[in-house]
């Protein structure tokens, strides 16, 4: 398989050929492929046949199933979300992925108890070359001092739950920004807007985290037929503002959330519609 694996510092892109990956779906190499890319902050699957494939969504879903179980949150649309920003829309109640305002660095669903492990973005069109900004956890941690990391590891932060979820409480329960997983590696679950902090020290720690993350961005510009898979535990992602006189930008994506272990959600996972619930 034409795979280029890099360390988490984003010096290179990881590129996987779609045809060869598709052929591996039922092969004995499936687990090897998954484990090989597990801890990368992102990778690209190239040459997805969007022009010739009349079953784009079904094939996209099958490819994402290589990494785990596609999921959705019960309050946020379909399992495959169509992302086509409107540059003229800026209402706070409109999800950021559907308007033209700057999308600051964040991890996906950080206000949920178990956020998805991956976000897969299939590029349908991108005439304006609008990229996805990615900042890698390893680079971030290298540039933060130990005391700041300790503060970010405290259960001292409540993250804003966006209005479109219709949740009665505006913020999640107290959680850390950074935590260690079962493998001893750091996970990162952050949304910088609307964070409530226990102390001023914790607020300053978040400001340091944001500064370092913003200073170490890699922009990934996807072409039609490329799937960008972002490791939601190992990186933050965002997008610059989209300006256009047109009602809709030329950038159109399909998005799927992926979980490595849906059983961990317990009774908050509905197998019939592949949906998680709660915060």
Where are these regions (language model features)?
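Short secondary-structure capping/junction motifs at helix and strand boundaries
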Residues: 68-78
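Short amphipathic C-terminal alpha-helix that caps PH/PH-like domains
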Residues: 56-67, 209
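N-terminal accessory beta-strand-rich subdomains and adjacent acidic, glycine-rich linkers
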Residues: 43-51, 58
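Active-site environment of non-heme Fe oxygenases that use a 2-His-1-carboxylate facial triad
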Residues: 1-25, 30-32, 36-42, 78, ...
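Mid-sequence acidic-hydrophobic segments that form the walls
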Residues: 66-70, 124-127
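Generic structural signal for well-ordered secondary structure
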Residues: 38, 53-56
């Amino acid at each position: 398989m034409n795979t280029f694996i890099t360390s988490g510092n984003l010096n290179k892109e990881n590129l996987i050929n779609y045809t060869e990956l598709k052929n591996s779906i039922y092969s004995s190499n499936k687990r090897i492929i998954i484990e090989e890319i597990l801890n990368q902050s992102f990778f690209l699957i190239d040459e997805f046949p969007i022009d010739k494939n009349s079953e784009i969504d079904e094939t996209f879903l099958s490819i994402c199933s290589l990494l785990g179980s596609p999921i959705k949150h019960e309050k946020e649309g379909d399992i495959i979300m169509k992302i086509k920003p409107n540059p003229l829309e800026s209402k706070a109640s409109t999800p950021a992925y559907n308007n033209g305002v700057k999308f600051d660095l964040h991890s996906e669903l950080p206000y949920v108890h178990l956020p998805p492990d991956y976000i897969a973005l299939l590029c349908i069109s991108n005439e304006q070359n609008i990229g996805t900004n990615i900042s890698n956890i390893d680079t971030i941690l290298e540039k933060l001092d130990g005391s700041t990391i300790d503060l970010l590891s405290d259960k001292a932060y409540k993250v804003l739950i966006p209005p479109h979820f219709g949740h009665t409480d505006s913020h999640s329960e107290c959680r850390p920004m950074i935590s260690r997983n079962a493998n001893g590696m750091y996970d990162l679950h952050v949304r910088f807007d609307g964070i409530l902090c226990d102390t001023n020290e914790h607020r300053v720690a978040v400001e340091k985290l944001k500064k370092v993350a913003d200073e170490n961005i890699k922009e990934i510009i996807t072409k039609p037929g490329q799937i960008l898979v972002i490791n939601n535990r190992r990186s933050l992602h965002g997008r610059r503002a989209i300006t256009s006189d047109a009602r809709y930008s030329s950038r159109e994506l399909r998005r799927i959330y992926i979980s490595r272990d849906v059983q961990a959600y317990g009774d908050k996972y509905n197998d019939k519609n592949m949906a998680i619930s709660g915060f």
